[in-house]
Structure formats: C-alpha cells, structure tokens
C-alpha cells in the first residue's frame, strides 16, 4: 500500500535510520516490521488481517487516526488519506502511550 510521512523525524528514521537511539531497540524493530507489512498490503483491509499488529481506530479527538502497536507502550499512529490515485496511509508519529 502507498504511504507517506507527516512527521519528518519518522521519515528520517525510515529512510536513513536517523533518531533510532531515541527509542528502545524492540520498538525500532517493530517499526520496520510494521512498515514492511504496510508496504506489502494491497489495501487497508489487509492490515486488519494481521492480528499481531493490533491495528485499530482511535477514538475521541483522534477518531480519524489509527494505530499499530509496536509494543505495550509504543504505537505507530497513522491516518487513511485519499488523493487522485486512491487511498494511502499517512504515517503520523511513533508515540509513547504511557505519557
């Protein structure tokens, strides 16, 4: 599935592995695994098939956002967007949900 980055820091992490030291090693590994799964997905429904991702829609003020759990503490947040070429995933951030 197509994706783009809202966050410059996450984009740099993905393409150049810059800023990796800011996160636990298991979070970095899970981030790259999640990105591989996103890239391989044909559409958004494919992400729901992988129960290990815990792909879910957020609620409240973040009702348009979704998340993938990287571990019990960290999540990759994203949003489904549309353009002339169809749906794509906008990667928002890697967030610590305990803070």
Each predicted region: which residue ranges?
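Non-catalytic, surface-exposed connector residues within folded enzymatic/regulatory domains
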Residues: 4, 25, 49-52, 88
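Conserved phosphate-interacting/catalytic interface
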Residues: 38
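Enriched for short, Lys/Arg-rich terminal
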Residues: 66-99
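Generic alpha-helical scaffold signal
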Residues: 29-32, 52, 68-72
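A short, surface-exposed loop/turn module that caps and links secondary-structure elements
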Residues: 43-66
């Amino acid at each position: 599935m197509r994706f783009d980055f809202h966050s410059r820091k996450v984009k740099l992490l993905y393409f150049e592995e810059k800023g990796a030291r800011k996160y636990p090693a298991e979070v970095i590994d899970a981030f790259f695994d999640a990105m591989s799964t996103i890239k391989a997905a044909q559409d958004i429904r494919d992400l729901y098939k992988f129960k290990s991702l815990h792909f879910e829609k957020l609620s409240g003020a973040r009702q348009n956002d979704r998340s993938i759990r990287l571990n019990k503490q960290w999540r990759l947040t994203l949003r489904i967007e549309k353009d002339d070429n169809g749906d794509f995933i906008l990667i928002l951030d890697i967030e610590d949900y305990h803070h």
